[in-house]
Amino acid sequence: MVFKRFLVAALLAVLLLSSASLPVHADQPSSTPDNTTPVSFTDISEHWAKDAIERWASMGVIVGEEGKFRPDDPLTRAEMAVILQRIMRYQTTSTDYFMDLEEEWYVDAIQKLRAAGVMVGDENNRAMPSESITREAAVVLIARAFGIYPTQQELHYEDTESISSWAVGYVSALSQAGYVRGGDNNCFFPAAPLTRAEAVTIFNNMITACISESGDYDYRPFEGLADFVIIGADNVNILNFDIGGNILLTEGVDAETIRLKTVKHYGEIWQYTYDGFKQHLKVYSYIVPVNENLPVCSYDPSLFVKDENGIMTYDDPRYTTYFGVDVSSWQGDVDWHKLKEQGVYFAFIRLGYRGYETGVINLDTKFEDNIQGALDAGIKVGVYFFSQALDADEAYEEAQFVLDNIKGYDISFPVVFDWETVSSDTARTNNIETEDLCQAANTFCNTIADAGYIPMVYCNQNVSMVYYELSRIQAFDFWYAEYKDQPTFYYNFDIWQYSDSAKLDGVPNANIDVNISFVDYSRINP
């Protein structure tokens, strides 16, 4: 994992420049609602890093002594460990102690950084807590803490040969990504010490928001794109924030309790765990962990092409795609021969639905007209049932209803379980549990498969990743709904419903849903 260029480009460059030329912009993060208690020091009133120091001191991340901060003193390795621990909030403590540690204030932080693989010590198993941290060592610790891995890209600093072997890969990674650059005479100065003010400024510039307590955080006064946002507590609601960089959840935070309300996010979401960094996704206002056992979407979004008639194709000779529609009684009377003339290859016909309040199962009033009309026009046909099942028993009832009503029809495309949320306070499915929904989908699809048809699950990003546990339904093909020119779904899908507002001849009185399929199901023998 390598974080975005705009997160730390020119920020870690602080490491490579003298304090007189540091690119300080600490006033930007200071406008965010951190968990703070005002703190100041007597020796920073005229210092270039005053705002950054006061901000991070007020959050309790840095401290001084006897009212002084000593901003231009070198930062020790112990102090760097404590700062990183207060930001990252590691929970696991290594029982493998460095040989040079005694009972001091920094031991807990160092041992937690050791457990996280951030601080590994030297070849003699020493942490050297009282020594000044060098620029190359600071790069290594920061990179490890934030998940930036070493690379072998060739370096072009004048003093490259002076960089230690254990640091050169990290320096290479940060340089390759544009995160660091040379100072005077294009030198890296790997052995030069890092001052306390320089260290604070690095974190101040990297991290726009550092949340350590539960609560609501409204960033409405903040302008521009935020950089790094770190969330170190459960039950956090973030509002009115444009985040250009990454969101990082610290160890142990329950992602299900975080809400990103009225938040635009352009970066990635990661959580540190003892097993390493795990990726998460923003789904509406939710944060959802990535399931590493599911196949990632294999399609290139840029290759989806829509023509002047709204027909979507996929511009890759390795794939053959098929254009289709889905209809219900909402479309009224449909001229299926006109749809066939416009290139419609397949159609999903709504067979029926369960009332979202009453729970009563109904046959779609246009089902028989639509399915017979599509078949007469030579269009391949599948059916879907709009489910509001609460459990497996109701899903079985729905599947049997479908099977009873498709007898005698040539069903060559899938039979679809279409469970959706309903925007109503009285919807019977409002409080459904994931376990019940997954059991319902499996029961419906297995019943359909047992009858000799191809089962499929339909849903959008919200239902698929917030309501379902996708690994529980991955045995079935997936029909994904997202009304955009390019899909953004993280996982693979078989059919994409890309619009619910298409205009096609043959459907004069309503919009129609249109789809692109990567599978010709009529050629599959289930």
Predicted regions: what they are:
Residues 2, 17-50, 58-111, 115-136, ...:
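Feature responds to low-complexity, polar/acidic, surface-exposed segments characteristic
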Residues 4-16:
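Sec-dependent N-terminal signal peptides
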Residues 48-51, 64, 79, 83, ...:
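Extracytoplasmic/secreted proteins, especially bacterial periplasmic and envelope-associated proteins
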Residues 118, 311, 317-443, 449-451:
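Substrate-binding cleft of extracellular glycoside hydrolase catalytic domains
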Residues 209, 403-417, 421, 468-492:
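Structural recognition of alpha->loop->beta junctions
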Residues 214-263, 267-271, 275, 279:
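Short, T/G/N/S-enriched strand-turn elements that build extracellular solenoid repeat scaffolds
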Residues 273-324, 471-526:
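Functionally critical loop-and-helix segments that line ligand-binding/catalytic clefts
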Residues 452-466:
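Aromatic-lined carbohydrate-recognition surfaces of secreted/lumenal glycan-active proteins
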